[in-house]
From Swiss-Prot:
Required for repression of mntH by MntR. May function as a chaperone that makes manganese more available by delivering it to the necessary cellular locations when manganese is limiting. It comes from the Bacteria. Induction: Repressed by MntR in response to manganese. It comes from Escherichia coli (strain K12). InterPro entries: MntS. The gene is mntS. The lineage of its organism: Bacteria, Pseudomonadati, Pseudomonadota, Gammaproteobacteria, Enterobacterales. Keywords: Cytoplasm. This is Small protein MntS. GO terms for biological process: cellular response to manganese ion; intracellular manganese ion homeostasis.
Length: 42
């Protein structure tokens, strides 16, 4: 939980461009996870 708070602190102090980059990375991870977890669907 402390790591999460630290991440949020860094996130809140980071510039807007960095926030967008982190959000896009997070979205990519979320979008790629189901495809990797269920290869039998394809």
């Amino acid at each position: 939980m402390n790591e999460f708070k630290r991440c949020m602190r860094v996130f809140s102090h980071s510039p807007f461009k960095v926030r967008l980059m982190l959000l896009s990375m997070l979205c990519d991870m979320v979008n790629n996870k189901p495809q990797q977890d269920k290869p039998s669907d394809k």
